[in-house]
């Protein structure tokens, strides 16, 4: 895996840095700083045994708390990634936030690509618990961005108000948001907007820096579901992802506002395709086309996305590993949402519901945000098809209830194939 330093010393950066600082000075300064951070942290830990540092998780209800044991903690506490990220930094957000009233949170984050390897003894069981039994030690993640395979992708627009597909991508060699320095965060922004400037046709657009927006402009974009919210979530702040806000954060979108990229929120980038109405097939086609083009432009400039065959695309939160994909709709289902079988129907269809404005919001006028619950172990095409088939089933149930007919709880979807 490429480290931040090795990436720094590639391509166009190398000659400038070597000329300015000299090879020896640059190398020595960087490595000594990393070594000092690691040595200081290790010496501090040696003062107390792991049992004295073990967090009190007795009242916690998140995946990390369920999987962490004193034995695992003792094994991993003094380990560090090459960038100096520790186990305690990984789990701090889950220690500070015991649980969530509506969803079971993960309770830990990665500070860099190497976190998933160095702390695999905890990450692997957390991933298996969160992702419906997917075992990263035994399984390989499939990928498929062929939108032509999608069927029945047009919803009844009397019920479905909008459609959206999003994912995240991380730039290899740079620390993830919980651990990145200001320089790394600014480099992510620079790499992304330089590449995005190469998009053409209906994907062409421009970048808007958060620091240059007025409060009114920011809030309007948030209210219209185009921009990420302000960093008020304790899950975000406790993980260190709100540091230096709004430095090097922003949104890029095409001129139609149907293809968007968030920069430096929870992940390096979030890639989004969205539009009003129920044409999920068109939304997914634009998503696939735009995502492939963004990756090509990134690679042309000497960078690449974090990926491996076990975990798929590497992102900050383990909940988004694999595809990182969430395909969702805003759907109005007043009768079905009040039916006691609603939650079981969603569970069997591998769907989850959120309020109209997302997590921690209420459903306004009986409009719910319905999306796939899985991210890894199934391809992008499979997940979008699951959402299409599932939402069509929900709409069919709503129509039956309107006519006074009974509805059935569907059988559970089969487990993803083991590969």
UniProtKB/Swiss-Prot annotation:
Pfam families for this protein: ATP-gua_Ptrans, ATP-gua_PtransN
Enzyme Commission numbers on file: 2.7.3.2
GO biological process, alphabetically ordered: heart development; phosphocreatine biosynthetic process; skeletal muscle tissue development
Main location (coarse class): mitochondrion
Tissue: Sarcomere-specific. Found only in heart and skeletal muscles.
Residue numbers spanned by region Cardiolipin-binding: 40-64
Annotated PROSITE patterns: PHOSPHAGEN_KINASE (PS00112), PHOSPHAGEN_KINASE_C (PS51510), PHOSPHAGEN_KINASE_N (PS51509)
Residue numbers of Phosphotyrosine PTMs: 255
UniProt cross-references to InterPro entries, sorted A to Z: ATP-guanido_PTrfase, ATP-guanido_PTrfase_AS, ATP-guanido_PTrfase_cat, ATP-guanido_PTrfase_N, ATP-guanido_PTrfase_N_sf, Gln_synth/guanido_kin_cat_dom
Location(s) in or outside the cell: Mitochondrion inner membrane
CC per GO annotation: mitochondrial inner membrane; mitochondrion
Entry binding sites for ATP: 162-166, 225, 270, 326, 354-359, 369
Disulfide bonds: none
GO MF annotation list: ATP binding; cardiolipin binding; creatine kinase activity
Membrane topology, record value: Peripheral membrane protein
Catalyzed reactions: creatine + ATP = N-phosphocreatine + ADP + H(+)
Keywords, alphabetical: ATP-binding, Kinase, Membrane, Mitochondrion, Mitochondrion inner membrane, Nucleotide-binding, Phosphoprotein, Transferase, Transit peptide
Transit peptide, from-to: 1-39
Domain Phosphagen kinase N-terminal: 46-132
Segments forming domain Phosphagen kinase C-terminal: 159-401
Family: Belongs to the ATP:guanido phosphotransferase family.
Subunit annotation: Exists as an octamer composed of four CKMT2 homodimers.
Anything else known: Mitochondrial creatine kinase binds cardiolipin.
Name of this protein: Creatine kinase S-type, mitochondrial
Taxonomic source organism: Rattus norvegicus
Taxonomic path: Eukaryota, Metazoa, Chordata, Craniata, Vertebrata
